[in-house]
């Protein structure tokens, strides 16, 4: 596994440590995040949690696509994978402790999902954001859509998901994907974490709880319809073509079936 969990004073750090692959998140890393969060949640000395990627090239380029054939190659395996992903994201969002994403370089796909599950997001000018699901024929999960909608709204979510393009740091700031773009990201984030650690934990938890309750959807989405759409995409020839094209380093030829 290439996930590091570190404790520095009152801050618990979770580090994606696979710089040769732009900190892509493999299966072992996904499975390690929720237990790491539980460990930090239980530690009374830890007041906040921070996520970062090793090096400066990437926070995380997303899920390790080299594993897609084995971990997401069928409708059933996609469902299992999405269940694991939901568990990971809820472990971050539902933590009683505030979380911060410190973003350098690429923050794509699953990496962006993790950042969106954090309470606060700060990035360097080098940061690039995006969700390339449409370029891979991939069915993006329900929780990922929900968090993106809550963060940037319906119009921006449509553009991000339909086009699959990348956005620079200033564009991400303008649409609300990040809270600030800062020149000295590490020292700025360290100061934010120091401020969080010094503030009253129960006061932060109170606000976190109230905010989460208010952003919950007041409607009743048709979950069966959403899951059917995911399954249809996961079983499609286009999804197989997207995976093959990525591994063969060519443009995919999607047929809509």
Task: List each language-model region with its residue ranges.
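Glycine- (often His-adjacent) and acidic-residue-rich active-site loop
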Residues: 45, 53-91, 137, 218
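Acidic, divalent-metal-coordinating active-site segment for phosphoryl/phosphodiester hydrolysis
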Residues: 165-171
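Conserved CoA-thioester-binding segment of acyl-CoA-metabolizing enzymes
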Residues: 1-52, 90
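CoA-thioester-processing core
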Residues: 88-94, 102, 108-161, 174-175, ...
């Amino acid at each position: 596994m290439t996930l590091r969990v570190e404790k520095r004073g009152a801050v618990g750090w979770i580090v994606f440590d696979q710089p040769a692959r732009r900190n892509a998140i493999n299966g072992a890393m996904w499975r390690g995040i929720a237990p790491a969060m539980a460990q930090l949640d239980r530690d009374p000395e830890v007041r906040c949690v921070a996520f970062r990627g090793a090096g400066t090239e990437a926070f995380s380029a997303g899920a390790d696509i080299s594993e897609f054939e084995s971990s997401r190659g069928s409708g059933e395996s996609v469902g299992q994978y999405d269940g694991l992903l939901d568990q990971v994201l809820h472990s971050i969002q539902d933590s009683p402790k505030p979380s911060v994403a410190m973003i350098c370089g690429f923050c794509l796909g699953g990496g962006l999902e993790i950042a969106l599950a954090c309470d606060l997001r700060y990035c360097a000018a080098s940061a690039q954001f995006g969700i390339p699901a449409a370029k891979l024929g991939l069915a993006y999960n329900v929780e990922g859509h929900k968090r993106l909608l809550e963060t940037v709204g319906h119009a921006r979510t449509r553009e991000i998901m339909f086009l699959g393009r990348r956005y620079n740091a200033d564009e991400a700031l303008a649409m609300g994907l990040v809270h600030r773009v800062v020149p000295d990201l590490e020292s700025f984030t360290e100061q934010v974490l120091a401020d969080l650690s010094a503030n009253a934990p129960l006061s932060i938890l109170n606000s976190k709880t109230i905010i989460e309750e208010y952003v919950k959807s007041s409607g009743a989405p048709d979950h069966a319809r959403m899951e059917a759409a995911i399954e249809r995409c996961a079983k499609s020839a286009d999804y197989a073509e997207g995976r093959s094209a990525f591994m063969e380093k060519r443009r995919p030829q999607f047929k809509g079936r």
